[in-house]
Amino acid sequence: MEHTVQIEELVVELSLDWLLGEVRIHHHDHPYLIIRQTTNQVFPKRYLLHHQVKGGRLVIQDRRKRIFSLGLHLYQTDLTIYLPKNQIQSMSIRCKGANLQAEGLRVENVYGHLTSGKTMLSGEIKHLLLETVGGLISSRQLAAQTLSLHATSSKGELMGAFSDVDLHVTGRRIQIHSTSMLHSLKSISTGAYVKVAIPENDGFTCYVKKRSGAFRNDFSCHREKENMVHKDGKRSFEVDIRGGHFLLSHQH
């Protein structure tokens, strides 16, 4: 069964709140926005998505939330959203147990709150803020000026071109591979393995605060007080390790 909604109004902000299933977000060549929900035959119509457009903001909600308390989350459904190009400026996505695929995005701001499930991102996002609990998160060919990642008990591998990176990692393993030199890096990790890979560069100053755990660095550095300085030392890195491992690696 397929439920399709076509939205002609101008939408600059998208807010999505969704549970289980596959969620895909893409751009298409049309000036309108399309929401397509596919379900099995037994899916009750009263639980089809709810949407509302107000002042350029589109809200899409999963109506199955109401029945979750009864444990009736057997109704399988997938969601695909087709966005017009050069229109959406910001997106807020909350997914619980869903597999999110948002590819080729061209937006200013993306906020994602992702609980379990898998997430794959690509495209150009100026400011990207991700919070993930128990999730698996990855990206390819992703360009982000600011990348802020709060990860708890999650695995992640983000590949792309990043400038300002802010990490808060608790448990499991997070890897960041940047094809461009970072402008700044802040990392607080607790009982986690964190790897940040950057290309050869003109220099950085890295302040390492280590309560327990291990710090490893692939770049040749000299010490200035509590700082490790590579070449001209211009870029500022701060690494706080509260157990686990942190590796600053050479991106070949």
Regions found by a protein language model. Name each.
Residues 1-252:
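Intrinsically disordered, low-complexity terminal regions
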